[in-house]
């Protein structure tokens, strides 16, 4: 069976987009040209690959059988080209990553720096987004994959967990709660809380975990970004409950983070990707690098957070 690789790619893109018009745009060819390419492929195979309607196209039984094989063939071909170019370090291309802000702050610069050392000609584009937009970016193929929370789920998405992090209290060092080693959530009642908007993944997680409590937190100030809440905390306007990763690396002169308990609320961060996505060789390598770096460094994550808290408490005492 002799098929041009371009025809195989056209078949895969048409199958994923379910539209000749959309597929033609993605391939940067005219719709008639795409139609001819698919028709020629069907004639060579002596089988119909698509059922065509006025609104969209769907795969036939033969098309469904061919699709995973076609994806694998394209992936292998791209990897072969990538590996050949690897010998001369002439990589080109771009990896697009959707990412929630706190993950960006903690380790992404390290990962990008390492990736750039290995593949200096591959660009990395970061789409810093909230949990829902991060998921949508991956679903619509705007990004190759993303780093997100696991409480935002979709049946079309695979989630690879990276870290399970607890929430901490962020308050000024002169706050009444600042000298405590641990703070119970109920102890926050009566204080003005600074939180991200109620539709955010972090806020939803907190409210779900505390929904059965007879008391309620006073979300007095609402912001868009966790970093903004830290600024308001530093100004003495209130206190905040943040994921551990959101606490600054370099200790603020006036802010401390204290573990929150009763209950301990955690969020799980990980890599999200479409189940049917075929990552480019460059994206596959960045994906693997992120997992390896996080696995190697995760033992230091909470050590660093605890050390920052311990030193801050010593300074207060």
From Swiss-Prot:
PROSITE patterns: HTH_LYSR. GO terms for biological process: regulation of DNA-templated transcription. It holds the Pfam family HTH_1. Keywords: DNA-binding, Transcription, Transcription regulation. One of its GO terms (molecular function) is DNA-binding transcription factor activity. Residues 1-60 form the HTH lysR-type domain. One of its GO terms (cellular component) is cytosol. Residues 20-40 bind DNA. Belongs to the LysR transcriptional regulatory family. PANTHER family: HTH-TYPE TRANSCRIPTIONAL REGULATOR YBHD, LYSR FAMILY TRANSCRIPTIONAL REGULATOR. This is Uncharacterized HTH-type transcriptional regulator YbhD. The lineage of its organism: Bacteria, Pseudomonadati, Pseudomonadota, Gammaproteobacteria, Enterobacterales. The gene is ybhD.
């Amino acid at each position: 069976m002799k098929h041009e690789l371009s025809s195989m790619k056209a078949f895969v893109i048409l199958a994923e987009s379910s539209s000749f018009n959309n597929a033609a745009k993605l391939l940067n060819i005219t719709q008639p040209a795409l139609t001819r390419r698919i028709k020629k492929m069907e004639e060579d195979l002596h089988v119909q690959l698509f059922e065509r309607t006025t609104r969209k196209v769907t795969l036939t039984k033969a098309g469904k059988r061919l699709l995973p094989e076609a994806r694998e063939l394209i992936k292998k071909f791209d990897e072969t080209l990538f590996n050949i170019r690897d010998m001369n370090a002439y990589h080109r291309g771009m990896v697009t990553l959707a990412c929630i802000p706190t993950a960006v702050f903690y380790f992404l610069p390290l990962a990008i720096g390492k990736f750039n050392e290995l593949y200096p000609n591959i660009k990395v584009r970061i789409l810093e987004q909230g949990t829902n937009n991060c998921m949508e970016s991956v679903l619509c193929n705007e990004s190759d994959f993303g780093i997100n929370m696991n409480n935002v789920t979709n049946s079309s998405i695979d989630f690879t967990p990276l870290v399970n992090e607890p929430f901490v209290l962020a308050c000024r060092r002169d706050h009444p709660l600042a000298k405590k080693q641990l703070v119970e959530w109920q102890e926050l009642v009566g204080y003005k809380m600074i939180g991200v908007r109620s539709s955010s993944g972090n806020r939803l997680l907190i409210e779900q975990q505390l929904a059965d409590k007879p008391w309620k937190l006073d979300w007095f100030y609402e912001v868009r970004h966790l970093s903004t809440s830290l600024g308001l905390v530093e100004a003495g306007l209130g206190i905040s409950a943040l994921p551990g990763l959101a606490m600054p690396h370099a200790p603020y002169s006036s802010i401390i983070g204290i573990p929150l308990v009763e209950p301990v609320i955690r969020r799980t961060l990980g890599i999200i990707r479409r189940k049917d996505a075929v990552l480019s060789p460059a994206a596959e390598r960045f994906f693997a690098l992120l997992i390896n770096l996080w696995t190697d460094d995760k033992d230091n994550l909470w050590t660093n957070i605890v050390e920052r808290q311990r030193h801050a408490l010593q300074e207060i005492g």
